[in-house]
A protein has these predicted regions:
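Transmembrane beta-strands of outer-membrane beta-barrel pores
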Residues: 10-14, 55-59, 68-72, 98, ...
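Membrane-embedded beta-strands of outer-membrane beta-barrel proteins
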Residues: 49-51, 90-92, 158-162, 203-205, ...
């Protein structure tokens, strides 16, 4: 037996009032970003492609999958940031049925690239761009008018899984992955400024029962991510060549997320229902070696969600999702050499810490309708959703999305 699948997507959107970031994929590349004090609204276009193939023979299964993302983020007014991203992930997996379990293993590889620049059309409005290095620090030698750079990176990962072959039993998952991203300054013959390293481990162990009209699952999870950053020591230039004479590991970041998660589902005449929830502990600690800077926060959180699905006819189905969550701060701390910091950097760091230690409440809702063309495997769908986030610092965030698509 064999099967193939694929998907294609396009997204366009807008982010309002973005400051202290002129690079795309902030969550991935932070703190090694390009930044300025002015910022503004940014527009984004994203193209996604995904496809795979799997074959099964007896107790053995083999599959391969490719995921590609191309993204363009830009601003139409000064400072005119632009980021162009290509991101390719390849996955290979195999599984074998042995005893009462299916044992699986997978390999993953990723290649990432981004070109990033900032331009000014009004000469009188030019402001400096900072090559940020973490917790309010900058690579001052290459900040100012050096506004064109690019990122190259990627990595690899391995995962192991065990799942019961029958409807009831224990299951487990483990994953290790490593990635690194190099920031290079295109203005100066692509000299590498910094390199960011990711090391991550994920472990999950649980029990489930999926038989009959009731489904129950409960698992415990631990996610650990260690990030570290090297700053290159760059010598004097010779014929536009900048030698690397050393490096220092200056930035360190440790993230922990551990939680218990549960699911309960059932079917009835009014449709299929599912409730899910989790409670957990989240911790984030950042450190810059010298001059010493620290920022940390820890939170306890809970989330409760629900889903309802029903077929309204042979060709129309409706799905409704809702969820609520709260993150409450339990500890926080900051150490900064404020006497030696620029006023604008002080304001940025204080603002960041203010929201790092804040408590957050979240609500989300989504409704989706699927329509299958009569006598065909082709379907159409429409989806409308939104997220509302409020925090204890009296600020809030809204996210709305609308999706239209074809399934086949």
């Amino acid at each position: 037996h064999s099967s193939a699948w694929g998907a294609a997507s396009y997204m366009t959107g807008k982010q309002y009032q973005v400051s202290w970031n002129s690079s795309s994929d902030y969550d991935l590349l932070n703190p090694y970003i390009l930044a300025d004090t002015l910022g503004g609204d940014t527009h984004c276009e994203r193209y996604g492609f995904q496809g795979g193939y799997a074959v099964s023979k007896g107790k053995f299964q083999l599959g391969i999958e490719a995921i590609f993302r191309a993204e363009h983020e830009y601003r139409n007014v000064d400072p005119r940031m632009r980021g162009i991203v290509t991101d390719l992930t390849l996955r290979l997996g195999t599984a074998y049925d042995f005893g009462k379990y299916q044992w699986a293993a997978g390999l993953e590889g990723n290649v990432y690239k981004q070109t990033n620049d900032v331009d000014f059309y009004r000469e009188l409005g030019v402001i400096p761009e900072f090559q940020m290095t973490g917790l309010g620090t900058e690579y001052s030698r290459f900040s100012g008018d050096k506004r064109t750079l690019y990122y190259k990176g990627g990595g690899y990962g391995i995962n192991l899984d065990a799942n019961p072959l029958n409807e009831t039993g224990f299951y487990g998952h483990a994953k290790l992955w490593r990635r690194q991203y190099k920031r290079m300054l295109a203005d100066l013959n692509s000299v590498p400024l910094t390199q960011l390293f990711y090391h991550s481990a994920e472990v999950s162990l649980g029990w489930k029962h999926m038989g009959g009209s009731r489904q129950v699952a409960l698992d415990g999870n631990l996610v650990f991510v260690r990030r570290s950053g090297d700053e290159n020591i760059i010598g004097k230039s010779s014929a536009q060549y900048y030698p690397i004479i050393g490096k220092l590991t200056m930035y360190k970041n440790y993230l922990i997320d551990t939680y218990l998660r549960g699911l309960y589902g059932w079917g009835s005449g009014s449709g299929t229902w599912c409730l899910n929830g989790k409670i957990g502990y989240w911790s984030n600690r950042e450190r810059y070696v010298y001059p010493e800077r620290k920022m940390e926060a820890a939170k306890i959180y809970g989330r409760l969600g629900g889903q309802w699905m029903r077929s309204l006819s042979r060709t129309v189905a409706l799905t409704v999702d809702m969820a609520a969550a709260y993150y409450g701060n339990v500890s926080s701390g900051i150490v900064m050499p404020y006497a030696n910091m620029k006023a604008s950097f002080q304001d940025m760091i204080n603002h960041q810490y203010q929201f790092e230690k804040a408590g957050y409440g979240m609500l989300s809702a989504k409704i989706r309708s699927d329509y299958r063309l009569s006598g065909s495997q082709i379907g159409l769908f429409a989806e409308l959703g939104g997220d509302w986030i409020t925090c204890s610092e009296n600020e809030h965030q809204h996210h709305l999305h609308l999706a239209l698509g074809i399934t086949f």
